[in-house]
Amino acid sequence: MDKNEIILKLKNTSTSPGVYLWKDAKQNVLYVGKAKNLRKRLLQYFDGAINSYKTSKLMSLVADFEVYICKTNKEALLLEKAMVDRFNPEFNILLLDDRKYPYLKVQLLKDSLLITLSRKVNTKYTKNTLYYGPFPSGYGAKPILKLLQHEALYESGLLIKNNDSSFWVNQFAKIKEILSFKNNNYLNELTNKMHTAANNMQFELALFLRDGLTYLKKLKESQIIELSQYKNIDVFAYKTDEKLIYATVLFYRYGVLINKVNLTIPLGISIDESIRVFFEQFYADKILPDNFIVQEEILKYDLNLSSDYKFISPKIGTNKKVLDLALLNLNDYYEKEHLIMQNQLEKADSMLSSLNKYLNLPKLKNIVIFDNSNINNINPVGVAIVYTNGIKNKSLYRKFNLEALSYRSADVDYIRQSITKFFSSDKNTKDFDLIITDGGLQQVNEAKKTLKVLGINIPVIGLVKNEYHKTRALIDLNLNEIYVNDLELHNYLAQIQIEVDRFAKSHFRNRQKISSLEGKLRNIKGLGHNMEQKLLNHFKSYAKIYDASVEELAKIVPFNVAKSIKNKDYE
């Protein structure tokens, strides 16, 4: 269909909410979008209301469209996500921020209180669960975790047991009160406890309380009293250039600034669509705040978000001050990053174009690379890493434990196992533009054979290393070994091999460590199979068991066993 025929067809399209697909002349899906009013949204593409550097390119390829009517916004959101996963459209964006930020999770149970750190948030949590966060990755959450565990779960250094439910209700309320920072009562109480411990020569306890007190005071100092009535407020500020959106998010909890996140968002077919995708993807695993404080232009966009997203654009007062603070941080981030990001995008685009001269594929948006690692076929592992638009997409990295094999060609079979595990998982999209195996002709042929068994049709190439473990050549789509003379492309492919090798070896070392930890744990006196399973069910891995404090371990196993684990008292 030409432009006039499409517009004519659009005029008969439903005005209901739903999902739309722009298609090219071969019926390939170019873009999947969501709209409150399908007809109005689709017509906007032709009247100039939707405009970015990608819009004109998209519309030059459009030859048809398809719509799906939905009853609710949530239904449309789920369908849109499913369609994007299914078709991997060229013009849809994916947030490349793979960071998972920890939350303090306080859960009131029938006869106890559970205080942990969690990177997974149940957004449908009940009144008996409190999430406090997100904290910065790598630090910040552990001091307050240990302090609150000490405060709520221990008395005179001993784990509290066998108290009635009303006691734990009071402890839960106390934790909520502490985290609200309503006054200095708890800080004063903590100061007195610290001095008492020091006077009684309990220096280890005094130091522990001092560290907790210092941390809480820093949080308290950042508190904006006028915001303390709100449990959660997030401040979102952004600015754009031709290809990217730069954003800063400030997280306020009861008026306390607990985290700041700077990130870069790929600019899709329009700014409003890109910002909508950001909010839906970024907050998919986070607690939505009571309010978002944003710039005025955000309110003008048709973001088509659920009613749970509440936006405020202040002109005066405290809210304006925190928005100005976010903008100040944003400008600093932009000045440092925008040239770097532009160069990175331009280089990635150039490298994909250079690579495609050898392949002649329709597009190279998503590439998945497979590798494995083992020593003498002991504890073999496999990994998959993904590059989106030529840039590492760590949110789609995957790792697998493989079945150990003893024969000489096991290395080739490990590619089969990795590809099978990757594409058999419902969590992974199957719509990739290219597969790269770390290895030569044998690995490429094994990958092709495996894909045929799985009923998946994706082109496969290989990257061959020399005797010094450096990138030597490319196995192309016709199974020819090609030496890449383009030095920049050669270095780019070498970096991909280095990255997949790094990820594979990192996972292998972790598996070796866990295997070793597993054996040591079973040598601890008084720790049997059932107790081991309880620990694993709670901590999820052997490494986390060994990283846990005595107090955390004692919630699951007897105190003497917890102490033996921490002291590494192996028989």
Curated annotation (Swiss-Prot):
Keyword field: Cytoplasm, DNA damage, DNA excision, DNA repair, Excision nuclease, SOS response
PROSITE patterns in alphabetical order: GIY_YIG (PS50164), UVR (PS50151), UVRC (PS50165)
Family matches, as InterPro entries: GIY-YIG_endonuc, GIY-YIG_endonuc_sf, GIY-YIG_UvrC_Cho, RuvA_2-like, UVR_dom, UVR_dom_sf, UvrABC_protein_C, UvrC
Domain UVR: 184-219
Subcellular location(s) per record: Cytoplasm
Main localization category: cytoplasm
Gene Ontology cellular component annotations, sorted alphabetically: cytoplasm; excinuclease repair complex
Keyword Lipid biosynthesis: no
Similarity section: Belongs to the UvrC family.
Record's function text: The UvrABC repair system catalyzes the recognition and processing of DNA lesions. UvrC both incises the 5' and 3' sides of the lesion. The N-terminal half is responsible for the 3' incision and the C-terminal half is responsible for the 5' incision.
Cross-referenced PANTHER family: UVRABC SYSTEM PROTEIN C (PTHR30562:SF1), UVRC/OXIDOREDUCTASE (PTHR30562)
Name used for this protein in its record: UvrABC system protein C
Species of origin: Mycoplasmopsis agalactiae (strain NCTC 10123 / CIP 59.7 / PG2)
Gene: uvrC
